[in-house]
UniProtKB/Swiss-Prot annotation:
Cellular component annotations (GO), alphabetically ordered: membrane
Naturally occurring in which organism (per UniProt): Arabidopsis thaliana
GO MF annotation, one: monooxygenase activity
Cofactor: heme
Protein name in UniProt: Cytochrome P450 709B3
Gene assigned in the entry: CYP709B3
Domain of life: Eukaryota
Primary location class: membrane
Keywords, alphabetical: Heme, Iron, Membrane, Metal-binding, Monooxygenase, Oxidoreductase, Stress response, Transmembrane, Transmembrane helix
Recorded family membership: Belongs to the cytochrome P450 family.
Amino acid sequence: MELISTINLLTIVLLLFVVSKIWKACWILLLRPLMLSKRFKKQGISGPKYKILYGNLSEIKKMKKEADLCVLDPNSNDIFPRVFPQYHQWMSQYGDTFLFWTGTKPTIYISNHELAKQVLSSKFGFTIIPVKRPEVFILFGKGLSFIQGDDWIRHRRILNPAFSMDRLKAMTQPMGDCTLRIFEEWRKQRRNGEVLIKIEISKEFHKLTADIIATTAFGSSYAEGIELCRSQTELEKYYISSLTNVFIPGTQYLPTPTNLKLWELHKKVKNSIKRIIDSRLKSKCKTYGYGDDLLGVMLTAAKSNEYERKMRMDEIIEECKNFYYAGQGTTSILLTWTTMLLSLHQGWQEKLREEVFNECGKDKIPDTDTFSKLKLMNMVLMESLRLYGPVIKISREATQDMKVGHLEIPKGTSIIIPLLKMHRDKAIWGEDAEQFNPLRFENGISQATIHPNALLPFSIGPRACIAKNFAMVEAKTVLTMILQQFQLSLSPEYKHTPVDHFDLFPQYGLPVMLHPLG
């Protein structure tokens, strides 16, 4: 009798467990999405229909695949429908603010400038979207871009001095040396008797910026920087291919062919970083310690006894991954699209070259004092960031029920802010919003539009990019030196195919023709 009672009790417990799991699954997969859809509909927000488990991922995948086949006119800057075909289609159906589903995750698309500013400027209530895919940390590192709360405050405080203007002033010479080194490689590609040099410049900029970040931030060699860059580029391919797939927790531990390759590449990246760190630890100087570059600042923090100024070695490795990847990607993309624009607009290229010759001569490596005099160059870079900014959208998540303008946003809702679209808003930028017109920045960013915070290439608010000044100094250094030594033109083989590869990337690269000057 006792045995039967025990069995009955276990059966009831098991049944309750199974029922609770079924209820939870029903809630996550069906009931919650239906409830939230109705809640948003009452606010006048609709969107594509939710599909169980997948949400709208299948539709996104299909639309992106079709858009990737489209080749645009090189003179057209109307790239939003190609880069984000899903947002373009849904905006035409549901308006400027709509709801869609990333799996079971509700996501609100907000392209209103004032609402976007409120979300990005908020210190409480919105945070970066929690990462569930393990390949994200393998690629980017669990560094400043992804940590939150007190850890983020501590890391930001420690890392800020590495990007001070005094430090940046000292970086222009090594940036220039790296640039001269790659110029020599370009000249070697010229065949006998040929005047022009044909190169795929987006790859070259990726290699150059990897060398610059390795040299200026980590004091590592060219070979070490390129090897690390190569491994991270391979990791990036796996990350991009996974974005439209549903992630099933636990699958990251299975020895699948993809996971095995990810583990192998991750090991290579970590070993490369450890070698760079070990080399710096061995070369510590009694006078200057570990140095005042990014790696030196972090290693100094590792020895601190104050928690607010201390970093663990595992945190340093993660920040190295983060800055190596972000440090090369942002500037290389900015340089790539600026080169395309100057190749198309030869008049502006000549204006910039004349300004460079007047302020910097024909062979001098520029410094930060020179940059303040290059007004036209700054205008061109601002316009390039507007039309082809590396960061094309920003994601946030509501950590509690929030009210933004007229919108009531439930806890756990993701928010997409489409910078690529907002930077082309004719209501803000005027009827020529799709046109390349650097003169709109003649009186500065704040006077370029009716909205003072309309240009957001590096975000805004507490989580604005820590290295934005580094990126701009790097871009100005490289661009100045290119204009000193080469005339730029597009190769006839170029296909205008901007694509969302986390950054805004040319799908088939950017082949250009370089004509050496002098």
